Amino acid sequence: MKILNLFLVSLLLSSCGSGSNKQNPQELNYYDIKGFFEREIKELEKANPTVNKTTVYNQEEEIRTLKIEKWEQELALFSESDINKSSWKGSYKIDSLPNQLIYSAKEEDLRTRKIVIDFKDNKPSKFSIQNKNSNYLYTSIEDLTFYPDSLYIIHKKQKVVLLGGNDYKIVGKLKD
């Protein structure tokens, strides 16, 4: 019985090792959007800025000034637009311009359709992301824009067969 307990404890400890599920940055196929937003979320949580947040749902507008409690939730759509899955290697066309990087989906079934990253002084200054989900019952289009340390915009249009459409937009302006 002692041997079995020791075996189970050692098995448990070995499975909790220092290994990580994150991909090594040298193995990434595309820009590390998920890593960028993870770092940005930590910085925003630390800074705890006040946000002027405008929410528009089907043309009904609400404006509030608040502190965001869960930045991970607030910016989830940006993080979820990561295209660095090993199965997607080669699935995006890469265009590189001075101070701009553009990824365009080559396959129609990919959710993230296009990513444009603008750079200033070799640092990202703007992210523009277009996502689309579609099937025979549902279509969802997301246009996401993020300016580090100043502004984020989430614009989502949904259309559900027999139920109609919804349009919502969130604009968050960070204040010092």
Could you describe each region identified by the protein language model?
Residues 41-117:
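Surface-exposed acidic loop/strand-edge motifs in secreted or periplasmic proteins
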Residues 2-9:
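Sec-dependent signal peptide recognition
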Residues 14-15:
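C-terminal motif of bacterial Sec signal peptides marking the signal peptidase cleavage site
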Residues 25-47:
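Post-signal peptide N-terminal segment of mature Sec-exported envelope proteins
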Residues 102-176:
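Extracytoplasmic electrostatic interaction patches
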Residues 18:
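Short, conserved catalytic or interaction motifs in soluble domains
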